[in-house]
UniProtKB/Swiss-Prot annotation:
Region annotation Disordered: where it falls in the sequence: 1-115
Organism: Gallus gallus (Chicken)
Motif annotated as Nuclear localization signal, chain positions: 301-305
Main location as per UniProt: nucleus
Name of the protein in question: Pituitary homeobox 2
Biased composition (Low complexity): 22-33
GO biological processes: anatomical structure morphogenesis; determination of left/right symmetry; embryonic limb morphogenesis; embryonic organ morphogenesis; heart looping; heart morphogenesis; positive regulation of dermatome development; positive regulation of myoblast differentiation
Span of the annotated motif OAR: 295-308
Gene: PITX2
Keyword DNA-binding among UniProt keywords: yes
Localization per record: Nucleus; Cytoplasm
InterPro entries in the record: HD, Homeobox_CS, Homeobox_Pitx/unc30, Homeodomain-like_sf, OAR_dom
Record SMART domains: HOX
Similarity annotation: Belongs to the paired homeobox family. Bicoid subfamily.
Amino acid sequence: MSCMKDPLSLERLGAGNNKLCSSSPSSSSSSSSCHHQQPALAMATALAPGQARSSLEAAKHRLEVHTISDTSSPEAAEKEKSQQGKSEDAGPEDPSKKKRQRRQRTHFTSQQLQELEATFQRNRYPDMSTREEIAVWTNLTEARVRVWFKNRRAKWRKRERNQQAELCKNGFGPQFNGLMQPYDDMYPGYSYNNWAAKGLTSASLSTKSFPFFNSMNVNPLSSQSMFSPPNSISSMSMSSSMVPSAVTGVPGSGLNSLNNLNNLSNPSLNSAVPTPACPYAPPTPPYVYRDTCNSSLASLRLKAKQHSSFGYASVQNPASNLSACQYPVDRPV
């Protein structure tokens, strides 16, 4: 009984009870073992009420802690195992993640490259069947052939872009150099203060080349003569107006013959221009394209001959100037 009253023995008793309850495999066995120990605990509380209560509270607290740890131990164990497995898996995987998988480079032979280049020159976008045929010829896989054509097209596009950039830097290229003239040759420089003083002279205009006038073989300064009536017509009208004043002693028959000669010498003019009623005010004739130099010289020579012939006739026949009433009449006596 003395050992039961001793507090140390009571604590040992509670600890033993705790161990028994915690080590039980099932709830039924733990409840039965605790149930068997309850009379001893009741006796200990009856013998030493103050110390037994404190020891009982401590034992109950330990029992609760042990039961909670027992119930949560499988889940905690699983969590700990999963965390340990993750850490073990992450250990060897970290270096593999850091290191990228290296690509396998294909080393083509010269024969394979020749075959691929020849096919690329014919067709830059081969279809699946063509790629398979090339793969059979070159002893390569279809994927390798497809990748080679993709890289080759990218290189070709880059080269085309570089060539276009060089053409833009050098101007419009060699094919446009003959069409575009330098700026200085097209527009000679003038100072801003000398525009009014210099002006455009006939010499500067004659030095310039006009392709339109060159094709017509006409000087640009003489272009006015193209759109004005020929000098031969005006000279002929002037000469015809001067005929009565020059030949005053010629009778009416002589004037008629002169008009007839003019009509015979210029049939084209008579068909185009009607004979005027008054020779002093002839109407302006329509435009007729003629060679101005040749026609004017020929008409002047013809008229000079006509004037000379009529002048001699008037000198040789002075009696022709007399009228009918001026002749002497012999009256019979």
